[in-house]
């Protein structure tokens, strides 16, 4: 039986790979997409997501979400993904539009109508998820779990300690981590290992139309290089759903720093249980890199 999922995203070049896997992995049933400001503005992430859905002829509803973090000024990752978020490929024109309600309400409505609890997957800042949990707490029993790409038990990537998706809206992340829902965190500890090799990248143009498109986007992606390999951060959240055997997880208490002058956005992961608090997050700490690199070509070959 396919696993029903809703995907909250901020495309973003590596988001495009994660979206492809979410659509085409036979184990998954992607039923709703929502966008959030993150890698670029929410107007751009929405445009990019609609372009991808049209490219794959995927009839999946999409709702536009939060344009700004809960309490602080927005930040983006255009230096990594380019000003548009997905430069490098000429997508064809289309007439697709987002739903007429905000993302968190679209998630609420879809959850309440679902015949079984749904897995939420968030691969951008957690603003939409925090709005859902704070404004619609009645939805919690309808959430099977939340799988996120975000955070780190060690070093950061936008500050010495903080990962971008959490640092972009620490207050939202703190709200989500305190919510009591089941959370799986695929952070930098595993995503920095999730590298597509130069040899594989070179084969993409001959794979299929998706391979050609991704190869064009990757030439503008700044999380690694075509010569050294590219990190597929967001894809790890989808990979865990399909191949959890590739990941080593540990239940930990995780808090999000929102006040520190130098540490705002840090996920404080209590790996050794020093604080004596019960675990609230399943933290991915290691990745079977060889297995991941074998799985990616399998799923992208289906993305025709």
Curated annotation (Swiss-Prot):
Question: Which GO BP terms sit in this record?
Answer: purine nucleobase metabolic process; purine nucleoside catabolic process; pyrimidine nucleobase metabolic process
EC number from the UniProt entry: 3.2.-.-
Q: Which domain of life is it from?
A: Bacteria
One GO term describing the cellular component: cytosol
| Class of the enzyme per the UniProt entry, highest EC level | hydrolase
Q: Which CDD domains match?
A: nuc_hydro_IU_UC_XIUA
Pfam families xref list:
IU_nuc_hydro (PF01156)
A single MF term (Gene Ontology): purine nucleosidase activity
SUPFAM superfamilies listed in its UniProt record: Nucleoside hydrolase
The alphabetical list of record keywords is: Glycosidase, Hydrolase
**Which catalytic residues are annotated?**
233
Which InterPro entries does the entry link to? Answer: I/U_nuclsd_hydro_CS, Inosine/uridine_hydrolase_dom, IUNH, Nucleosid_hydro_RihC_nonspecif, Ribo_hydro-like
Output the HAMAP family linked to this UniProt entry. Answer: Nucleosid_hydro_RihC
Family assignment from sequence similarity: Belongs to the IUNH family. RihC subfamily.
**Primary role:** Hydrolyzes both purine and pyrimidine ribonucleosides with a broad-substrate specificity.
What is the name of the protein in this document?
Non-specific ribonucleoside hydrolase RihC
Q: Please name the source species.
A: Shigella dysenteriae serotype 1 (strain Sd197)
């Amino acid at each position: 039986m396919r696993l029903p999922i809703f995907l909250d995203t901020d495309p973003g070049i590596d988001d495009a790979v994660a979206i492809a896997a979410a659509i085409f992995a036979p184990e998954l049933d992607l039923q709703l997409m929502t966008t959030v400001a993150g890698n670029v503005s929410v107007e751009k992430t929405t445009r990019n997501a609609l372009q991808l859905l049209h490219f794959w002829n995927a009839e999946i509803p999409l709702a536009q979400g939060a344009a700004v973090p809960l309490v602080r000024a927005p930040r983006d990752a255009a230096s990594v993904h380019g000003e548009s978020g997905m430069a490098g490929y000429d997508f064809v024109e289309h007439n697709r539009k987002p739903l007429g309600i905000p993302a968190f309400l679209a998630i609420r409505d879809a959850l309440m109508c679902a015949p079984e609890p749904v897995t939420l997957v968030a691969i951008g800042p957690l603003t939409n998820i925090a709005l859902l949990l704070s404004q619609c707490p009645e939805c919690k029993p309808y959430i099977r779990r939340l799988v996120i790409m975000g955070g780190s038990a060690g070093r950061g990537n936008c500050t010495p300690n903080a990962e971008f998706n959490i640092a972009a809206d620490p207050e939202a992340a703190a709200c989500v981590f305190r919510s009591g829902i089941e959370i799986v965190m695929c952070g930098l500890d595993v995503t920095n290992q999730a590298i597509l090799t130069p040899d594989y990248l070179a084969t993409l143009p001959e794979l299929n139309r998706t391979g050609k498109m991704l190869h064009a986007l990757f030439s503008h992606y700044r999380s690694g290089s075509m010569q050294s390999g590219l990190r597929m951060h967001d894809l790890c959240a989808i990979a865990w759903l399909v191949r959890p055997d590739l990941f080593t997880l540990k239940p930990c208490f995780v808090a999000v720093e929102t006040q520190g002058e130098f540490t705002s956005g840090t996920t404080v992961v209590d790996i050794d249980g020093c604080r004596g608090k019960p675990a609230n997050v399943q933290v991915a700490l290691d990745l079977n890199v060889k297995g991941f690199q074998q799985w990616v070509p399998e799923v992208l070959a289906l993305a025709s």
